[in-house]
């Protein structure tokens, strides 16, 4: 999938994956979904769910490092700054052939334009927080969040999933490469 097509789907994910309400119990349910999958898959990840003013859920699998926690901080900062997914920002920047510093004068020490940070949006209220995963390749970090949100909110995962990175056969049977 080309960057522009990916970007359109990233925008669609944000439009569809919204909550009617969001509180500590919902944060716990979302975090538990992500934690159970991480455990089942053997993922070495950090999971962070927060309202912008405070953390609501934090889990770290054995083997993660402070580096993963720093990625979480930077991804959450990006979501809070732009009110959209960190992966969407990365795609917009890639299309424009810019980075965070060139486009927004933001330091990569504090912001990340990598997949794995997603806005928590409440219908009628807007973006109130973020969910972030760090420890997998960025596209997988992002997709883990999308899968959990689809499960929790009752949406079709296939309709909102990015194509996997790597080589695959397209609808015409031609093998194509997908970058993340």
From Swiss-Prot:
TM helices/strands, residue ranges: none
SUPFAM superfamilies: GlcG-like
Domain of life from the UniProt record: Bacteria
InterPro entries the record matches: PduO/GlcC-like, PduO/GlcC-like_sf, YBR137W-like
Annotated family: Belongs to the UPF0303 family.
Protein name: UPF0303 protein PSEEN3311
